[in-house]
Amino acid sequence: MRILGIETSCDETGIAIYDDGLGDSPEGILAHRLYSQIAVHADYGGVVPELASRDHVRKTIPLIKEVLADANLTPKDLDGVAYTAGPGLVGALLVGCSIGRSLAYGWELPAVPVHHMEGHLLAPMLEDDVPEFPFVALLVSGGHTMLVRVDAIGEYKLLGESVDDAAGEAFDKTAKLLGLDYPGGPALSKMAESGEAGRFKLPRPMTDRPGLDFSFSGLKTAAGTLVRKECLNLSDSDLKQTHADIANAFQQAVVDTLAIKCKRALQQEKLSRLVIAGGVSANTALREQLAITTKKLGGSVFYPRPEFCTDNGAMIAYAGLQRLKAGTDADLTFKANPRWALDSLPPVK
């Protein structure tokens, strides 16, 4: 079966076609295109929802045409249309939902609304080395940080989540404090590479108590306090190094916090396989630390290739195909669901 996937939940327009006849591997991705709105939002220091929606309107249909041409296919060669229905920015979601549902109707194909975080969770299934069920998943991005027990597709148990800022959001806000341009998360990670480890110490939030929830708001505040305290009356070279040292301390605090919680989750659920997905899962320091953590537990860690860590159409196409094979076909009264609980999804039978 072949399915078109449409992703428009935030500030990236992702379109892909996936064919399960080629297996759960990179070869199943017949074509994919991704358009990022970084240039649109850079002057504002963050995503402007109205501008995001308008840009999705401008780019979605042209990208669909390009992906069909890349795969040398026509709509008659497809078996369904999948689109992100939530969570995300409601205006951005409505663009993808309306286009996806309309195309499915016009092409006389099933329409499959997809949960954005289920797409991220299943993204490692697009690799050659795929995890077996059950496993613990760490979903970590700009909008979400959560730990989930996964027994099968659609069988999800929420173990813990952020009670305030997501990890990716904390990265971006701290990067702004350090004078880095939007999007700041990757830039902060790059800056941290030249920082002196151990010069500054920041807290590991909520690791001193039981439970698997996260909190990054206080860590962001602590980093801001450190910037204001340590970055006064410095030469340009000293300021640059101090910023790098603070970036290193911040990143290590986030990585340690995530690793501690992942270890707890694996031990609590008596599992050995860990999946990490979402934009922050591309962070090299996080991958290295979680590899060490799982190895000590006799387990292993799985993650998507970097290009599929961020929002993309391939993960939506793959997740949508699993739902399509289970009989999902949305009626014409579709809706966007900006606050859609992952553990409310029905299992795939």
Swiss-Prot record:
Keywords of this entry: Acyltransferase, Cytoplasm, Iron, Metal-binding, Transferase, tRNA processing
Catalyzed reactions: L-threonylcarbamoyladenylate + adenosine(37) in tRNA = N(6)-L-threonylcarbamoyladenosine(37) in tRNA + AMP + H(+)
Keyword Transferase: yes
GO cellular component: cytoplasm
EC number: 2.3.1.234
A biological process term (GO) from this entry: tRNA threonylcarbamoyladenosine modification
Gene3D superfamilies: 3.30.420.40
Record localization: Cytoplasm
UniProt xrefs under NCBIfam families: gcp_kae1 (TIGR00329), T6A_TsaD_YgjD (TIGR03723)
Function: Required for the formation of a threonylcarbamoyl group on adenosine at position 37 (t(6)A37) in tRNAs that read codons beginning with adenine. Is involved in the transfer of the threonylcarbamoyl moiety of threonylcarbamoyl-AMP (TC-AMP) to the N6 group of A37, together with TsaE and TsaB. TsaD likely plays a direct catalytic role in this reaction.
PANTHER family in alphabetical order: TRNA N6-ADENOSINE THREONYLCARBAMOYLTRANSFERASE, TRNA N6-ADENOSINE THREONYLCARBAMOYLTRANSFERASE, MITOCHONDRIAL
Protein family per UniProt: Belongs to the KAE1 / TsaD family.
Protein name as annotated: tRNA N6-adenosine threonylcarbamoyltransferase
Native species: Colwellia psychrerythraea (strain 34H / ATCC BAA-681)
